[in-house]
């Protein structure tokens, strides 16, 4: 029987002790003496959120299919346990073996959201691993990061030994083999890092040098070693049926996770070209999984987990070419078990009424759509590809299908935005409310219509056409939200429209971290040392701490947030080849200013650069 790292009296003191004990259904147990590599896979947030991360579960399953690797999980301890661990000098441990992280060969950290960066430092701190990679010794675990935020790893470069860029299914096999070979040959930590840097998709920050101009922009970025490539190319799998790691028995959490269901990934990438969307660019090309493969996976995962809900995961579920077939299958196959079907990421113009009605037969819920902008002009700027007619027609079809609750997501602070664009959010919500009363006869209405409008504030992200765009100050974002709020109050159906908005200070900090360079690491470290932690949680976020950190380090946040970049400027992430070319992104930036729409990947090739992968959904690749 395993000995838990935490004593019973500690477990009784803390909130949700089940976060830390492991032993869940489908957790993988091995004998540590029988493996060559021990990999601690960390998520820099609480257990419930990390256990909902599909990428982490796929890699956990894939690594453990290797006989020579034992992958174990860990998550950020909540503040109550964090305090006790520091007071009693208890080292951070993994769930499976309950062993200290310090004993492992690798510490892998998922980087999905910039506001978790101080939690990355918490993981290192509680593990007893030096913050800076340059200060680590031979026996310290190699710290590796991956995920969407790794497409600009520079703000964290000082803290990581290496990053993987792209999809982990392709990278880690070669990395593990190189580690074993280096260990067998008696090579040093530095020997391994040099070999790792030559594996496609692996970035070792210490092997690259950055210089800066007097104005603060980057002067040069180059590798220090002849064998280390100047460009790091993202890695991906093209055949989602042959090369995809089929997840059959995901770990079932002890406590309710944020996404407490089976997640069925139906495709990767997105055929649309929304100019604000990083995921839509970095995960190109779109690659679909075959519907027969999905049917088999659904049966197996539901059987092995006991979950009562299955979610179809993708960036745009409506664009999956076999959506109706898989939805019909899931509803018919699992009707007796009352399995609920969740369809996130739907486009309002592509949501078929027959599919919608069948999903509703199982369980009624509100529908979520994301027009993103209130006016047609601004939707053209961001390349949303939706007309007002599309939106109202789609909402009408939804109302006819029995829904009376709709969630609408918009962004404020988009490039070229005017006051009319902001007020357009209220006007569109009003028109959707009117549509409900127009298309649904009074005797068929399930109460009043409820329109929930939510606005976030725009954050420019790397590898998007808007990566050069300026942001706004917090007070400017608040004024924009007030414009929308006041306009909603003036609408005829104002009582049917609820409005909320994201906190602007979090947005500004996210913008700083998203487009930061290596100089930003000292701000992150200083903020952590002053008490910043769980910045993604509104109840824990302390912007005053960050302001002090900027002041004490002498870093000007507005240099990173308010400044429009020149397209000639060397950007911190330019050394990464993410598939989409800079030439394409510049062209799309210009198209945005011209309010011109670019067709999606099934309509016409936009010349984005991903043809080189020779696969996926691309009209040109089939010629």
Q: Which role fits each region the language model picked out?
A:
Residues 1-28, 33, 39-41, 490-623:
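Radical SAM enzyme core and accessory elements
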Residues 10-40, 47-48, 205, 211-263, ...:
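N-terminal [4Fe-4S]-dependent radical SAM core
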Residues 39-44, 50-72, 77-85, 89, ...:
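Low-complexity, highly charged intrinsically disordered N-terminal segments
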Residues 41-45, 63, 251-278, 302, ...:
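N-terminal pre-triad scaffold of radical SAM enzymes
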Residues 41-46, 115, 299-407, 412-452, ...:
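Conserved SAM/AdoMet-binding glycine-rich loop
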Residues 47-50, 79-82, 115-117, 150-153, ...:
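Flexible loop/turn segments at secondary-structure boundaries
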Residues 53, 255-292, 607-622:
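Canonical Radical SAM [4Fe-4S] cluster-binding loop centered on the CxxxCxxC motif
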Residues 76-222, 465-517, 524-539:
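Glycine-rich beta-alpha loop elements in corrinoid/cobalamin-binding modules
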């Amino acid at each position: 029987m395993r000995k838990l790292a935490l004593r019973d009296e500690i477990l009784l003191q803390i909130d949700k002790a089940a976060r830390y004990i492991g032993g869940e259904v489908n957790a993988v147990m091995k004998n540590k003496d029988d493996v060559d590599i021990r990999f601690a896979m960390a998520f820099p947030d609480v257990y419930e959120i990390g256990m909902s991360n599909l990428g982490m579960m796929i890699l956990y399953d894939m690594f453990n299919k290797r006989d020579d690797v034992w992958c174990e999980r860990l998550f950020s301890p909540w503040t109550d346990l964090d305090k006790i661990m520091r007071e009693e000098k208890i080292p951070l441990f993994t769930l499976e073996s309950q062993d200290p992280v310090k004993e492992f060969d690798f510490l892998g950290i998922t980087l999905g959201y910039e506001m978790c960066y101080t939690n990355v430092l918490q993981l290192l701190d509680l593990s007893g691993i030096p913050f800076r990679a340059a200060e680590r010794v031979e026996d310290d675990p190699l710290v590796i990061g991956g995920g969407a935020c790794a497409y600009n790893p520079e703000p964290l470069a000082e803290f990581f030994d290496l990053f993987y860029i792209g999809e982990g299914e392709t990278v880690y096999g070669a990395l593990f083999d190189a580690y074993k070979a280096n260990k067998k040959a008696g090579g040093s930590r530095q020997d391994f890092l040099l070999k790792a840097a030559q594996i496609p998709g692996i970035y070792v920050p210490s092997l690259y040098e950055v210089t800066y101009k007097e104005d603060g922009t980057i002067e040069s970025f180059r590798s220090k070693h002849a064998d280390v490539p100047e460009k790091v190319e993202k890695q991906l799998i093209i055949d989602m049926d042959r090369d995809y790691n089929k997840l059959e028995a995901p770990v079932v959490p002890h406590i309710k996770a944020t996404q407490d269901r089976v997640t069925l990934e139906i495709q990767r990438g997105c055929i649309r070209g929304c100019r604000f969307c990083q995921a839509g660019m970095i995960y190109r090309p779109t690659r679909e999984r075959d519907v027969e493969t999905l049917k088999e996976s659904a049966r197996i995962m539901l059987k092995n987990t006991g979950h009562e809900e299955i979610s179809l995961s993708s960036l745009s579920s409506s664009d999956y070419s076999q959506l109706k077939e898989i939805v019909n299958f899931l509803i018919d196959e699992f009707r007796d078990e009352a399995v609920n079907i969740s369809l996130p990421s739907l486009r309002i113009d592509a949501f078929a009424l027959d599919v919608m009605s069948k999903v509703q037969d199982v369980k009624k819920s509100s529908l979520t759509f994301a027009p993103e902008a209130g006016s047609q002009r601004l939707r053209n700027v961001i390349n949303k590809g939706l007309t007002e007619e599309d939106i109202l027609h789609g909402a009408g079809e939804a109302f006819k299908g029995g829904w009376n609750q709709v969630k609408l997501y918009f962004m404020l602070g988009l490039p070229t935005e005017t006051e009319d664009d902001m007020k357009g959010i209220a006007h569109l919500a009003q028109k959707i409310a009117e549509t409900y009363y127009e298309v649904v006869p009074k005797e068929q209405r399930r109460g009043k219509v409820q329109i929930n409008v939510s606005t976030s504030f725009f954050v420019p992200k790397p590898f998007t056409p808007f990566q050069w765009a300026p942001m706004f100050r917090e007070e400017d974002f608040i004024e924009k939200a007030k414009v929308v709020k006041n306009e909603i109050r003036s609408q005829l159906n104002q009582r049917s429209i609820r409005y909320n908005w994201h906190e602007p200070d979090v947005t500004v900090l996210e913008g700083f971290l998203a487009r930061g360079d290596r100089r930003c690491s000292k701000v992150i470290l200083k903020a952590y040392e002053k008490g910043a932690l769980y910045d993604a949680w509104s109840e824990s976020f302390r912007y005053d701490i960050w302001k002090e950190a900027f002041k004490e380090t002498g870093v000007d946040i507005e240099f990173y947030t308010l400044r429009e970049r020149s397209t000639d400027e060397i950007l911190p992430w330019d050394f990464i080849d993410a598939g989409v070319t800079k030439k394409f992104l510049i062209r799309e930036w210009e198209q945005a200013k011209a309010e011109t729409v670019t067709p999606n990947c099934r309509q016409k090739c936009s010349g984005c650069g991903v043809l080189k992968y020779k696969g996926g959904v691309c009209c040109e690749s089939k010629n």
